[in-house]
Amino acid sequence: MSAVGSYRSPLQVIRAYCELTKPKILLMLAFTSFSAALVATHGSVDFAKLLFMFIGTALSSGGAAAINMWYDRDIDAVMERTQGRPIPRGMIDPEKAFRFGLLLGVLSFVVLYVLVNPLTAWLGLAGYIYYAVIYTVWLKRRTPQNIVIGGGAGAMPVLIGWAAVTGTLSLAPILMFLIIFFWTPPHSWALALYKNAEYTKALVPMMPVVKGPRSTKRQSVVYTVLLFATSIALYFTHAVGALYLVIAVPMNVVFLYATIKMHQEADDTFVWAKRTFFWSLVYILVVFTAMMIGM
């Protein structure tokens, strides 16, 4: 029996609404925005403004995620990886999830516009629309380039973090944006390779489903090379110091090695696809930490 309409404790309801915001992704986005803000000010950041930026970014990200779960509820019910989300398991009515997502989006714009600055608010709104509409509604079910083009949504928080403390944008935050943009395909496709059967069942045109493992792996290597070049280019903006380079270079080598090994393994074997996915998470954590300690 569906849980919608049955008794749910207040704690269960709160937990379900929190799950709608995809908190793990939200934390990663908050981390990258914090890194950008710290690099922009070389550590001399206004922590009150930083706090409001965090709140606004979290509201924007969480609201877009809720809209995503509302729209994708049919897919989520099919895929084993997502069947435990609040809407498929009946914890939240779809219409309420949609209204919740819209509310968070509006609150995000107000918080960022009033308490941070207008540029940050417009960037937050752009990120919200990018993920909730452009990626979720337009791209995800229509093209294998869904996460390539949609990767910009996950990269927006670095622009938000930088703009929050400077009121402007420059080459450095754009390169930080591109780091996440180029990181997204090998990260997402590594997961899609070993979850290929689920995406096929749900009729989601991920790259492995449409173009096959061989093409997906080859493109993953290309994007990792672009990622390598972009992350090194950041050093030459003088936004980060030599310590960043000392950490970023070997981290890029490791990640590139993983994607090459993934490309070399048999298409029905996923050992290196899983390792590449793991190293992609390590990569983003280490490289953005290196930006902060090496500025």
Where are each of the predicted segments found?
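Small-residue-rich segments of transmembrane alpha-helices in multi-pass membrane proteins
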Residues: 30-34, 85-86, 148-165, 214-215, ...
